[in-house]
Amino acid sequence: MGCVFCKKLEPVATAKEDAGLEGDFRSYGAADHYGPDPTKARPASSFAHIPNYSNFSSQAINPGFLDSGTIRGVSGIGVTLFIALYDYEARTEDDLTFTKGEKFHILNNTEGDWWEARSLSSGKTGCIPSNYVAPVDSIQAEEWYFGKIGRKDAERQLLSPGNPQGAFLIRESETTKGAYSLSIRDWDQTRGDHVKHYKIRKLDMGGYYITTRVQFNSVQELVQHYMEVNDGLCNLLIAPCTIMKPQTLGLAKDAWEISRSSITLERRLGTGCFGDVWLGTWNGSTKVAVKTLKPGTMSPKAFLEEAQVMKLLRHDKLVQLYAVVSEEPIYIVTEFMCHGSLLDFLKNPEGQDLRLPQLVDMAAQVAEGMAYMERMNYIHRDLRAANILVGERLACKIADFGLARLIKDDEYNPCQGSKFPIKWTAPEAALFGRFTIKSDVWSFGILLTELITKGRIPYPGMNKREVLEQVEQGYHMPCPPGCPASLYEAMEQTWRLDPEERPTFEYLQSFLEDYFTSAEPQYQPGDQT
């Protein structure tokens, strides 16, 4: 028999839903999460290309740095001489080992994330990760060029430890095509450490300027000038912002469905209802996280179909799916995040010391990842702190997206299951199986309470049945201790009973990113008197 709160479970899974798009699904609360390990990791570049979900074979994946320096194949048109931005150690016999500054001729760039190249220094030929190189003498090859990152992400990186006053970066303009923005770390007695932003405008006849008094032929010339004199800026440009080596896009060329023997499970990081999470090594070379699923947890065929969609979802705030072992027991191989789940992190001493600005920033990162999923018409279905992972510099990434509807266990059925995460689930999803991006918005509001309370279970003192009965009548959790009224108001907006009245993730991202700066100008004037 079903529980009292399961009034009507509507039909589940249509052809559209099987593709991972919005629809009515059963969900589950993935208890699998793992704990800390002192391993450094940096988020990969943002993936801007929107896939065609109905045609996996035709995907063209565009590395994050590519813009005006993009090569257009090896027919002699475009740039073919590239330079390494980072060191790289070969992972397979087909890879090239190389060091930062090494130059290559690109022989074949038609297969997405991994290019065939010949090293000019060693003469060897092999595969290289495309996001580890840039065209020689291009702006993308400069250490201070960070490409397509937003204002808030620039602030996160510049304010991270190791950057002095005057640390800077150049990024693409968020509003003007072909223009750039300069972000500089500054300090004063009133605000302490903070970041100021300047627009780098482009002249119609070519050239760039911040103030019309001084114009330059290139961005490189502009940077060199302001490293010598501040000329109206808040500070001299002292040094490029520190950068950690990015994740490669995938483990290696053609490393998607991998053999079980290529994975070494080294240490169990966590145990959940349907399997374990391990720290592992792929091919004896690459540290990864491995989720091992108990046989019968989900259909291998259904999992592989969903994984084909999941691997195309690439964003800085989503945990990258590297590879799968598709025969039971299923292995899901992802990038490793050194601090484990957000839920565990909030409860440890470092998490307990976090202050409101840091907590709001972590929420903004989750909202950014969900805004990407919103644009891609993809639903998470189990958004909560246990399914957010934390890396270096308080980087937050969304994990376990898309897996919820594949679980076959009735205990994760909202009608029958004691394990179903009622306290995070929107009423229309819990009562009728209507999972949409708007039910994810509801869950995000609950996640906000987890952040503010440093990992407290939602609706303290109430059981699941009481929660659903009360929520259906319009009950909201009261404002958590220490939570500003304006932030609680945003939570309440996510808990509106009518899903269409809930805000978008795009709005929530903007609200949270600007939460402490909405009264200040985002960019400094170029011409100052």
Swiss-Prot record:
Subcellular location: Cell membrane; Cell projection, Ruffle membrane; Cytoplasm, Cytosol; Cytoplasm, Cytoskeleton
Lipidation sites (S-palmitoyl cysteine): 3, 6
Lipid-acceptor residues (N-myristoyl glycine): 2
Entry comment describing in which tissues the protein is expressed: Detected in neutrophils, monocytes and natural killer cells (at protein level). Detected in monocytes and large lymphocytes.
Keywords of the record: ATP-binding, Cell membrane, Cell projection, Cytoplasm, Cytoskeleton, Immunity, Innate immunity, Kinase, Lipoprotein, Membrane, Mitochondrion, Mitochondrion inner membrane, Myristate, Nucleotide-binding, Palmitate, Phosphoprotein, Proto-oncogene, SH2 domain, SH3 domain, Transferase, Tyrosine-protein kinase, Ubl conjugation
Reactions mediated catalytically: L-tyrosyl-[protein] + ATP = O-phospho-L-tyrosyl-[protein] + ADP + H(+)
GO cellular component: actin cytoskeleton; aggresome; cytosol; extracellular exosome; extracellular region; mitochondrial inner membrane; mitochondrial intermembrane space; plasma membrane
EC number(s) from the headed UniProt entry: 2.7.10.2
Domain Protein kinase residues, every copy: 263-516
Post-translational modification remark: Ubiquitinated. Becomes ubiquitinated in response to ITGB2 signaling; this does not lead to degradation.
Subunit structure comment from the entry: Interacts with ITGB1, ITGB2, MS4A2/FCER1B, FCER1G, FCGR2A and/or FCGR2B. Interacts (via SH2 domain) with SYK (tyrosine phosphorylated). Interacts (via SH2 domain) with FLT3 (tyrosine phosphorylated). Interacts with PTK2/FAK1. Interacts (via SH2 domain) with HCLS1 (tyrosine phosphorylated by SYK). Interacts with SIRPA and PTPNS1. Interacts (not phosphorylated on tyrosine residues) with CBL; FGR tyrosine phosphorylation promotes dissociation. Interacts with PIK3R1 and FASLG. Interacts with CLNK.
Protein's UniProt name: Tyrosine-protein kinase Fgr
Species this chain originates from: Homo sapiens
